[in-house]
Amino acid sequence: MKKYIILAFTAMLPLAAAAQQEEEATENGIVSVDGTKGFTITSKKGDFVFKPYALIQTTANFNYYDDEGLDKAYNQDNVANTGFAIPYAVLGFTGKAFGRVTFNLTMNAAASGGNLLQQAWFDVKLKEQFAIKVGKFKTPFTHAYLTTLGETLLPQVPTSLTATTIMPHTLNAVTPAIGTGFDLGVEIHGLLAKKFGYEVGIFNGTGASVNTATKTFSDDWHIPSLLYSARLTWMPKGVMPSTQGNPNRLHEDKMLFGLSVSENVESESESTNDFRAGFEFSMLKDRWYVGAEAYYMHVGFTKRQKIDDTFNYWGAYAQAGYFVTNQLQLAARYDFMDRNSTGKDGLLNMPAVGVNYFFPNTNLKLQAMYQYIGRTGHATQLDRDNDDLGQPMHTAKVLLQYTF
């Protein structure tokens, strides 16, 4: 049944609806580059725009891991993945050509392999209601990922989106996370009546680290083994800026409600078919920012795996930020995840607090956060120990960011 739904979904691409981020000539998803930042080369008519930009982040990290039930005789290190890091050293340029084609190319020097090319896309806007975007860019799923990278409330996205899921099968290749992030593909999108946005896309489904065509046809469904994704939003007060805190936007009154779905056909080394769905809410009201999301993932194995089990996972979070002064923003988040599937008892609950300081007239931003990962409702101590494997119980992070 699912394969017919996906085929119908693909055939109806021009008619589908899903969420839209604010479209500007300098939109890039990394930093806000409005006319007050950096410099821009513009033609006299304004139909050609070229704008370079940069984002540099340096972090100091402390992570404390639970013993996970191991005896002290193993002499395991509780403190790991601690020290300094550069998660992003981004250099890119964005712009507009012929008055209707926007483009963006971004390299992340802090990454390796295929992740070096963070983004590379062009977007042909035929009219406000219809545009075509091609290349490597953010997939239309979750407010947390679609927020401008340099304007997130906390220096890491919710763990419920990034943590790999747990299932009782020894298939090392099958460790899907709920979040999808960057990918290669094509999407159509537009804005209807200044309030309704849509994005519908087809992607490789292999993530940001792969820049080549590696997919095949599904043996079970006989359709291309790709990621089919769509997102629909309603913005009752006009287009919602893709920010979770910007000192230049302290008088906004915007709101967004969104729904998204996707199916990754023969993902995880052709082992599974992964269905995802999500609901999101975000709001900017003067000095307040509020965001909340809930998402679900269904994992079913391909016939070649000869595994009849299916697994369902979900996660959710709510977060808020408030500018106490024009430069100081306080932040809090509560994150939940059913990491070991709905078939087993137990949840991860992850409260976090943070503070952000924006240095005036410098484009410098200082962020600090603390997160605790708790475990509740597990049937056995072994389940409790396994549920947060690879995840730190205590996380403290300080991030200094410069944008240009």
Protein language model regions, located:
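Outer membrane beta-barrel
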Residues: 39-65, 69-208, 224-239, 319-331, ...
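Transmembrane beta-barrel architecture of outer membranes
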Residues: 88, 117-119, 183-185, 225-229, ...
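Detector for outer-membrane/organellar transmembrane beta-barrel domains
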Residues: 231-340
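Outer membrane beta-barrel transmembrane domains
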Residues: 319-321, 325-375
